[in-house]
Structures are given as C-alpha cells and as structure tokens.
C-alpha cells in the first residue's frame, strides 16, 4: 500500500492470562466507574469557613455595641464569609491495581470470545494522511474499530483522528472506557507483549 509500511512478523500466540479470562461484569463495572470518576476535573470550588482569607481579628468588641456578638468575618452569616456545608468534592475513586488489571484482561477476553478482536501486522503511515488510514481499515474488513499498537506513532495517530468510527490507542494506555466503547478491536503483533505486561498480575 502506497504510503503505508507494514512489518511482517510471525503472528504471536495470544497469552491466556490476557485473552482467556472469564468475564467479570461486576469487576468491569467497578473499573469503569473508577476510571470515569478519576477523569472528572472537580473544578467547582466553594470556600467554607476555614478556606476564606482573613478574619483572624475579632471585628468588634464583644459587648457595648448593641450588635450581635461576632468572632470572625469568615462566618457564613457575613457577606464575603464562607459557605455553610460547602460542596467540596473529591471525585477520585481508588481501585486495587490487581483488580484493575483483571478487569482489563476480562474485557479483552470478552472481545476475543465474541470474535470482535483481530490481530493485524504492525503498521505505520509514512504521512499523516486520513486517506492512508481509510485504505488500511478497508483491508481489515471492519467498519468501526479501536487500533491498539505497541507505541504511539505520530503519523498513525494524526491519520486516524479524523475518522469518527475508528480510534487509536497505545497498548500502555488501555483503559476500560475506550475498550468498552469500541465495536471491534484491532491489535498489532508487537502490542501483544505490551498488553501482557500491562495486565500482568504479580
């Protein structure tokens, strides 16, 4: 194919610890929830009484003014004071690394079982042209897929990003969201050992 380099190597054996794991829906759901929660920015910031600057000095004396006593201008009762029960959220959801890896293996195994996972030869585009990506995917016979490679090749990434039905992912960066969103998964030969390392439960 013009503009596309394919490296022919012997097709590797699919390691059972990555592609022959029983699907665990509960574990996969937990991994997906954890991943999505950790992607949230949590940019909303409300200041409670302790977060507001100033207010170290008592605003006026305790008695003799006729006003209600006050100890600080940071009180929620004052204009410019803190917010009562400020909604300060940390969306981070931690998950045991071993469980997270098992969830990824579970997803990959499900794709293999359902015959939605295809091994392809290593590929790289000489130029970052969408046309080259279209020609490559047409040869695979799938109309929508996620291509997983051993490393993030810049030309390949740029060539694929304009295609709505196709995605590109470095094997080191696989996550439950992108995997589950895919209709079909294409895995390059050189990505197999990387995937094995990523989901390796020690």
Q: What residue spans do the PLM features occupy?
A:
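Extended polybasic, low-complexity segments that bind anionic RNA or targeting/receptor surfaces
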Residues: 1-41, 87-202
């Amino acid at each position: 194919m013009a503009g596309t380099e394919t490296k022919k190597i012997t097709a590797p054996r699919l390691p059972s610890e990555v592609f022959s794991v029983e699907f665990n829906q509960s574990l996969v759901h937990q991994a997906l929830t954890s991943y999505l929660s950790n992607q949230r920015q949590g940019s909303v910031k409300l200041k409670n009484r302790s977060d507001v600057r100033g207010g170290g000095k008592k605003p006026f004396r305790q008695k003799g003014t006729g006003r209600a006593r006050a100890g600080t201008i940071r009180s929620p009762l004052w204009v410019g004071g803190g917010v009562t029960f400020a909604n300060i959220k940390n969306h981070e959801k931690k998950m045991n690394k071993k469980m997270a890896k098992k969830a990824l293996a579970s997803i990959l195994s499900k794709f293999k079982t359902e015959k939605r996972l295809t091994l392809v030869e290593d590929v790289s585009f000489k130029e970052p042209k969408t046309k080259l990506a279209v020609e490559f995917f047409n040869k695979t016979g799938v109309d929508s897929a996620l291509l997983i490679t051993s490393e993030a090749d810049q030309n390949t990434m740029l060539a694929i990003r304009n295609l709505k039905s196709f995605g590109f992912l470095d094997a080191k960066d696989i996550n439950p969201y992108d995997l589950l969103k895919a209709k079909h998964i294409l895995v390059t030969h050189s990505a197999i050992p990387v995937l094995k390392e990523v989901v390796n439960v020690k």
